[in-house]
UniProtKB/Swiss-Prot annotation:
It is found in: Nucleus. Residues 4-130, 210-269 bind DNA. Residues 170-200, 268-289 are annotated as: Disordered. It comes from Xenopus laevis (African clawed frog). SUPFAM superfamilies: Homeodomain-like. GO terms for cellular component: nucleus. Residues 185-194 have a biased composition (Polar residues). This is Paired box protein Pax-6.
Length: 422
């Protein structure tokens, strides 16, 4: 043991590169594991790396041995010709067999021991080599047939090779008709080709059968598996082994079943979420581009120009004083109170809402107050001059705004009315 090869690990333990742990340390690792200590605790107690502890325990659980593997040089070959022949025999008996099943049969039949049993990856490598050898043998047989056919066609044509030479139309074809005694040989070769084709068909069928048949579960097994799946979607190795002993199934089959069942559960959960979202989404109401006239009534437009409302005729009388006073005003814009009011029936409280009155002319006598007329009823009344009787008209409050007012029909005391708004 050289000092240059020794060292101290991260936990403070001493190790030697390339050399296994002492048997005493290995025995302590196994004893602590049997006492219930976790690998991380064993690593801290014995100052051995966690990877080393896990590797020793894994090999102990798998083979029951704590001895180290062979060190130095190449590992002994475990895939001996005898083991390879056995693997090929098992594969021929059951083409859908798994590598771990072959490994179990090698152990149960005593072909190998725990020390020289090949790993699952080694068995898979042997199976791949056997399949490639079969394919290579089949391709070599096909090449032999092609070479044989090439040799026969060389006697049929005028020149040797893969493709016989074509005869010229003017050239007599005696050479192609001469070999008559080789007909029997040709029939023999055809029959041999038929046998080889049958073998090729059998090989193809065997290759198709390499896929493992689906495992069929009984109702009791399915119920037990579903019950365990309801408890947990990811059972540990102990739960799988307990379930395997209960329903008489290999632990690997149970692991594959749980993997497939989880995939099915994810698909079903996705569909449930889609249905839930579809049920929560409200149905779309089509929006109509046209509105009913009963809901939104059109606002009537004035039929006469705005300039006509500036004259005295819009008051419904021919008073010269009013005509002179209103004719000097600028033209009114089209936005008037009558046009902007909503179309609603008159309310009794609105009949006296407008109390601003216009002064009457001294020449007008014997007039009475008229009731308030809504704007939608006076749209066509503004353009027609009325008589000398009192009518509803619009009076100016400010430039650009006109409101309907009541014109007094008599000469009462003007002190009870508001003065004209300036």
């Amino acid at each position: 043991m050289q000092n240059s090869h020794s060292g101290v690990n991260q936990l403070g333990g001493v190790f030697v590169n390339g050399r296994p742990l002492p048997d005493s340390t290995r025995q302590k690792i196994v004893e602590l594991a049997h006492s219930g200590a976790r690998p991380c605790d064993i690593s801290r107690i014995l100052q051995v790396s966690n990877g080393c502890v896990s590797k020793i325990l894994g090999r102990y659980y798998e083979t029951g041995s704590i001895r180290p593997r062979a060190i130095g040089g190449s590992k002994p070959r475990v895939a001996t010709p005898e083991v390879v022949n056995k693997i090929a025999h098992y594969k021929r008996e059951c083409p859908s067999i798994f590598a771990w099943e072959i490994r179990d049969r090698l152990l149960s039949e005593g072909v190998c021991t725990n020390d020289n049993i090949p790993s699952v990856s080694s068995i898979n490598r042997v199976l791949r080599n056997l399949a490639s050898d079969k394919q290579q043998m089949g391709s070599e047989g096909m090449y032999d047939k092609l070479r044989m056919l090439n040799g026969q066609t060389a006697t049929w044509g005028s020149r040797p090779g893969w493709y016989p030479g074509t005869s010229v139309p003017g050239q007599p074809a005696q050479e192609g008709c001469q070999p008559q005694e080789g007909v029997g040989e040709n029939t023999n070769s055809i029959s041999s080709n038929g046998e080889d084709s049958d073998e090729a068909q059998m090989r193809l069928q065997l290759k198709r059968k390499l896929q493992r048949n689906r495992t069929s579960f009984t109702q009791e097994q399915i119920e037990a598996l579903e019950k365990e799946f309801e408890r947990t979607h990811y059972p540990d190795v102990f739960a799988r082994e307990r379930l395997a002993a209960k329903i008489d199934l290999p632990e690997a089959r149970i692991q594959v079943w749980f993997s497939n069942r989880r995939a099915k559960w994810r698909r079903e959960e996705k569909l449930r979420n889609q249905r839930r979202q579809a049920s929560n989404t409200p149905s779309h109401i089509p929006i109509s581009s046209s509105f009913s006239a009963s809901v939104y009534q059109p606002i009537p437009q004035p039929t006469t120009p705005v300039s006509s409302f500036t004259s005295g005729s819009m008051l419904g009388r021919t008073d010269t004083a009013l005509t002179n006073s209103y004719s000097a005003l600028p033209p009114m814009p089209s936005f008037t109170m009558g046009n902007n009011l909503p179309m609603q029936p008159p309310v009794p409280s609105q009949t006296s809402s407008y109390s601003c009155m216009l002064p009457t002319s001294p020449s007008v006598n014997g007039r009475s107050y008229d009731t308030y007329t809504p704007p939608h009823m006076q749209t066509h009344m503004n353009s027609q001059p009325m008589g000398t009787s009192g009518t509803t008209s619009t009076g100016l409050i400010s430039p650009g705004v006109s409101v309907p007012v009541q014109v007094p029909g008599s000469e009462p005391d003007m002190s009870q009315y508001w003065p004209r708004l300036q």
